[in-house]
Amino acid sequence: FSIREADVHLAAGLPLTWIRNQREAFRSYLLQNPEVHYRFNGKEYHLHFAGCSLYPQGYPAIVNHLGNFKGTNLLADIGNGTMNILYINNKKAQESRCWTEKLGVNQCMIAAKNAVLDKFGVKIEESTVEQILRFGTADISAPYLDCISSIARQYVAELFSTLRKYEYNPDLMRLYVVGGGGCLIRNFGTYDKSRVTIIDDICATAKGYESLAYMSLKRRG
């Protein structure tokens, strides 16, 4: 049994600093085709787009954790190209206190590859660097591992320095980290683990979009 035709309500996200000004334009873009027909694995499918809900990127990933939020909390969504920062006070997102910094994981990747090239005169596979960033180690010789680890530690230090620029104080608030950058903080950061929560679930954002959209549609009846 499989569903081949359905009404679909889209739930998606925009960068925090874009959500106010671009929400309606992006909604119109996503709904420009009221229905689509396509073939997948030899079967025909037909979707009708019934609506679209848009949310700030990052925030949906922590929706299921809001029950634990008290007072002031800071959310850092560290993606491939950017880091989105959002304050959440008493479980409510503060849209006036959100920022986007071009400090994504790819910057660390580029810096690590360049460091190896500069120091050893060789090019290193991106997949090898990715393994080190994700797991903290790889099957390479110690000098190369030390070089890349040093760059990763510098990158994480810069992340925390940037957060402090926006008044992050671990003694006064808890930090929640989502996105691919969380593994770098875990592997190469120096922080109070009791005050920082790293959400590893790669589906957390998608689950959050679904939960928020479902609650919104339920309220409308």
Predicted regions and their residues:
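Nucleotide/phosphate-binding catalytic cleft detector across ATP-hydrolyzing
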Residues: 1-73, 92-107, 127-221
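Acidic, metal/cofactor-coordinating or nucleic-acid-engaging core segments within structured domains
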Residues: 113-119
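Phosphate-handling catalytic cores of nucleic-acid transaction enzymes
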Residues: 76
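Short, basic interhelical loop/turn and adjoining N-cap
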Residues: 120-124
